[in-house]
Amino acid sequence: MIGRQLIQLLQHRHHELISVRHDKHPGEFKQISNRAGNTVFVRPDLVRGTLEQAYALYESLARGIKRSIFMMFVISEIHPFDDGNGRIARIMMNAELVSAQECRIIIPTVYRDDYLLALRHLSRSRNPDAYIKMLVRAQEFTASIDFSSYEKALQQLRQANAFMQSFEGKLIF
């Protein structure tokens, strides 16, 4: 898929994700710079070009986990929208996995701090090891859950502490 088509798909999925939040401009790239703490994301006027450059690299990667990990980071790092950037990054990541018939990745509540710290570490250090390890562990966790019934999945998620805050417990599986 060429960069332009992938950008259109990203915008379409974002529109679907937050379509009821008109004030957040569903499917439209940001017009005002955004930040999280000390992290300043890509300037609005550079979003499209940065995505196009990133997608050129994306196409060189093998389908599946490699592309999904890259996709997740690119969208998280660019933060192309006013809102919903983390959610759309995870949607795009999982779409890559599904298209390669690989297990999706769920980031349970208890693992959220690990997830954010690994993203921040990669952004600041340019060392992807912790980020890759975190996502592989999350995928292994997701694969360990039996989703054949709601009751089974819910029980396993509770046993794994998935719904706890990180200060209340750790992910167990």
Per-segment meaning from a language model:
Residues M1-F173:
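FIC/Doc superfamily catalytic core
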